[in-house]
Amino acid sequence: MSDKSIEGLIKRLASTSPNPDYLDDENALKCCRLALDACEQGNYGVAALLLNERREVVAQAENRVFSQGYNSSAHAEMILIDQLEQGSLGHSPAQLTMLVSLEPCPMCLSRLLLSGIGSVRFIANDSDGGMISRLNSYPPAWRNLVQLQNHYRAHVSEPVLKIAEDLAAMNLANLRHKLFMHIGS
Protein backbone atom coordinates (compact mmCIF):
# COMPACT_ATOMS: atom_id res chain seq x y z
CA MET A 1 0.00 0.00 0.00
CA SER A 2 1.43 3.38 -0.97
CA ASP A 3 1.85 6.27 1.46
CA LYS A 4 -0.78 8.91 0.61
CA SER A 5 0.49 11.60 3.01
CA ILE A 6 2.18 14.73 1.67
CA GLU A 7 5.52 13.32 2.79
CA GLY A 8 4.74 10.00 1.13
CA LEU A 9 3.72 11.70 -2.11
CA ILE A 10 6.93 13.77 -2.09
CA LYS A 11 8.94 10.55 -1.77
CA ARG A 12 6.91 8.75 -4.43
CA LEU A 13 7.29 11.63 -6.87
CA ALA A 14 11.03 11.84 -6.20
CA SER A 15 11.49 8.12 -6.79
CA THR A 16 9.26 7.82 -9.88
CA SER A 17 10.95 8.18 -13.25
CA PRO A 18 9.09 8.60 -16.53
CA ASN A 19 8.54 5.32 -18.34
CA PRO A 20 9.53 5.81 -22.01
CA ASP A 21 6.84 3.29 -23.02
CA TYR A 22 4.17 5.83 -21.98
CA LEU A 23 3.90 8.91 -24.18
CA ASP A 24 2.70 11.28 -21.46
CA ASP A 25 4.67 10.06 -18.44
CA GLU A 26 7.33 12.79 -18.45
CA ASN A 27 4.90 15.70 -18.66
CA ALA A 28 2.45 13.94 -16.34
CA LEU A 29 5.13 13.81 -13.65
CA LYS A 30 5.75 17.56 -14.13
CA CYS A 31 2.02 18.10 -13.78
CA CYS A 32 1.90 15.98 -10.62
CA ARG A 33 4.76 17.98 -9.08
CA LEU A 34 2.71 21.14 -9.61
CA ALA A 35 -0.36 19.44 -8.13
CA LEU A 36 1.72 18.52 -5.09
CA ASP A 37 2.66 22.18 -4.71
CA ALA A 38 -1.03 23.07 -4.83
CA CYS A 39 -1.69 20.57 -2.01
CA GLU A 40 1.15 21.98 0.05
CA GLN A 41 -0.39 25.46 -0.35
CA GLY A 42 -3.77 24.25 0.96
CA ASN A 43 -5.48 23.90 -2.42
CA TYR A 44 -6.92 21.01 -4.41
CA GLY A 45 -4.19 18.73 -5.75
CA VAL A 46 -4.77 19.56 -9.40
CA ALA A 47 -2.47 21.12 -11.99
CA ALA A 48 -2.34 21.62 -15.75
CA LEU A 49 0.22 22.13 -18.50
CA LEU A 50 -0.19 23.65 -21.94
CA LEU A 51 1.94 21.77 -24.45
CA ASN A 52 2.96 22.71 -27.97
CA GLU A 53 3.05 20.28 -30.90
CA ARG A 54 6.45 18.95 -29.74
CA ARG A 55 5.01 18.22 -26.27
CA GLU A 56 7.06 21.05 -24.78
CA VAL A 57 5.55 22.95 -21.86
CA VAL A 58 4.59 26.50 -22.88
CA ALA A 59 2.68 27.34 -19.68
CA GLN A 60 1.73 25.70 -16.40
CA ALA A 61 -0.61 26.35 -13.51
CA GLU A 62 -1.86 24.74 -10.35
CA ASN A 63 -5.11 25.03 -8.45
CA ARG A 64 -5.25 28.25 -6.39
CA VAL A 65 -8.86 28.26 -5.20
CA PHE A 66 -7.89 28.87 -1.56
CA SER A 67 -4.54 30.65 -2.06
CA GLN A 68 -5.76 34.17 -1.31
CA GLY A 69 -9.03 33.77 0.49
CA TYR A 70 -11.35 32.13 -2.02
CA ASN A 71 -11.49 32.31 -5.81
CA SER A 72 -13.91 29.84 -7.40
CA SER A 73 -12.37 30.35 -10.84
CA ALA A 74 -8.78 29.64 -9.79
CA HIS A 75 -8.74 26.13 -11.22
CA ALA A 76 -5.49 25.28 -13.02
CA GLU A 77 -7.24 25.02 -16.39
CA MET A 78 -8.96 28.38 -15.96
CA ILE A 79 -5.69 30.12 -15.06
CA LEU A 80 -4.04 28.79 -18.23
CA ILE A 81 -7.01 29.73 -20.42
CA ASP A 82 -6.87 33.26 -18.97
CA GLN A 83 -3.19 33.50 -19.96
CA LEU A 84 -3.93 32.16 -23.42
CA GLU A 85 -6.82 34.57 -24.00
CA GLN A 86 -4.72 37.52 -22.84
CA GLY A 87 -2.29 36.69 -25.65
CA SER A 88 0.64 36.29 -23.29
CA LEU A 89 1.61 32.82 -24.56
CA GLY A 90 2.15 33.55 -28.26
CA HIS A 91 0.68 30.26 -29.51
CA SER A 92 -2.31 29.37 -31.64
CA PRO A 93 -4.82 27.62 -29.35
CA ALA A 94 -5.66 24.96 -31.94
CA GLN A 95 -2.04 23.76 -31.90
CA LEU A 96 -1.96 23.33 -28.13
CA THR A 97 -2.78 20.43 -25.84
CA MET A 98 -3.79 20.87 -22.23
CA LEU A 99 -2.64 18.08 -19.95
CA VAL A 100 -4.54 18.08 -16.64
CA SER A 101 -3.82 15.93 -13.61
CA LEU A 102 -7.57 15.38 -13.02
CA GLU A 103 -10.48 15.11 -15.44
CA PRO A 104 -11.83 18.66 -15.93
CA CYS A 105 -14.99 19.73 -14.11
CA PRO A 106 -18.01 21.10 -16.05
CA MET A 107 -16.89 24.72 -15.58
CA CYS A 108 -13.37 24.05 -16.86
CA LEU A 109 -14.42 21.83 -19.73
CA SER A 110 -16.95 24.39 -20.93
CA ARG A 111 -14.26 27.03 -20.89
CA LEU A 112 -11.83 24.68 -22.65
CA LEU A 113 -14.38 24.11 -25.42
CA LEU A 114 -14.68 27.86 -25.95
CA SER A 115 -10.90 28.42 -25.82
CA GLY A 116 -10.10 26.75 -29.13
CA ILE A 117 -7.43 24.54 -27.55
CA GLY A 118 -7.02 21.56 -29.87
CA SER A 119 -6.73 18.69 -27.38
CA VAL A 120 -7.36 17.96 -23.72
CA ARG A 121 -5.71 15.04 -21.95
CA PHE A 122 -6.32 14.14 -18.34
CA ILE A 123 -4.38 11.78 -16.10
CA ALA A 124 -6.89 10.68 -13.45
CA ASN A 125 -10.65 10.17 -13.78
CA ASP A 126 -12.93 12.26 -11.59
CA SER A 127 -15.98 10.07 -11.06
CA ASP A 128 -17.59 12.69 -8.79
CA GLY A 129 -17.02 15.85 -10.81
CA GLY A 130 -15.38 15.13 -14.15
CA MET A 131 -17.16 16.15 -17.33
CA ILE A 132 -15.22 14.46 -20.13
CA SER A 133 -16.74 11.11 -19.17
CA ARG A 134 -20.17 12.79 -19.42
CA LEU A 135 -19.86 14.61 -22.74
CA ASN A 136 -23.23 13.30 -23.90
CA SER A 137 -24.86 15.20 -21.01
CA TYR A 138 -24.09 18.54 -22.62
CA PRO A 139 -26.95 20.38 -24.38
CA PRO A 140 -26.93 20.01 -28.20
CA ALA A 141 -25.11 23.28 -28.93
CA TRP A 142 -22.30 22.30 -26.56
CA ARG A 143 -22.10 18.79 -28.02
CA ASN A 144 -21.37 20.49 -31.35
CA LEU A 145 -18.42 22.27 -29.74
CA VAL A 146 -17.22 18.98 -28.24
CA GLN A 147 -16.66 17.69 -31.78
CA LEU A 148 -14.08 20.43 -32.39
CA GLN A 149 -11.76 19.30 -29.61
CA ASN A 150 -9.96 16.01 -28.88
CA HIS A 151 -10.49 14.57 -25.37
CA TYR A 152 -8.75 11.52 -23.96
CA ARG A 153 -6.98 9.91 -21.05
CA ALA A 154 -3.28 10.61 -20.91
CA HIS A 155 -1.03 7.68 -21.76
CA VAL A 156 0.69 7.21 -18.40
CA SER A 157 2.17 4.37 -16.39
CA GLU A 158 0.33 2.95 -13.38
CA PRO A 159 2.65 4.60 -10.79
CA VAL A 160 2.05 8.04 -12.35
CA LEU A 161 -1.71 7.45 -12.50
CA LYS A 162 -1.78 6.46 -8.81
CA ILE A 163 0.18 9.58 -7.83
CA ALA A 164 -2.30 11.80 -9.72
CA GLU A 165 -5.26 10.02 -8.11
CA ASP A 166 -3.76 10.37 -4.63
CA LEU A 167 -2.99 14.06 -5.18
CA ALA A 168 -6.57 14.70 -6.28
CA ALA A 169 -7.86 12.96 -3.14
CA MET A 170 -5.41 14.68 -0.78
CA ASN A 171 -7.17 16.49 2.08
CA LEU A 172 -10.43 16.43 0.10
CA ALA A 173 -12.76 16.35 3.13
CA ASN A 174 -11.11 19.44 4.62
CA LEU A 175 -11.16 21.28 1.28
CA ARG A 176 -14.84 20.50 0.76
CA HIS A 177 -15.53 21.78 4.28
CA LYS A 178 -13.70 25.03 3.44
CA LEU A 179 -15.74 25.33 0.25
CA PHE A 180 -19.05 24.78 2.01
CA MET A 181 -18.09 27.23 4.75
CA HIS A 182 -17.43 29.83 2.09
CA ILE A 183 -20.66 29.33 0.16
CA GLY A 184 -22.68 29.18 3.38
CA SER A 185 -24.02 25.63 3.26
Regions of interest found by a model, annotated:
Residues E56-V65:
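Short beta->alpha transition motifs characteristic of CBS
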Residues A59-Q60, A76-H91:
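Glycine/small-residue-rich phosphate/adenosyl-binding loop
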Residues G90-L102:
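Immediate flanking context of iron-sulfur cluster ligation sites
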Residues E40-V46:
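A short helix-loop-beta-strand connector motif used in the catalytic cores of GNAT acetyltransferases and
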Residues M1-A38, P104, R111-S185:
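Zinc-dependent deaminase
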Residues V46-N52:
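Short beta-strand scaffold segments in enzyme catalytic cores
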Residues V65-I79:
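A short, polar/charged loop-to-alpha-helix boundary motif
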Residues Q41, E53-R54:
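Short, ordered coil/turn segments that flank beta-strands lining enzyme active or ligand-binding pockets
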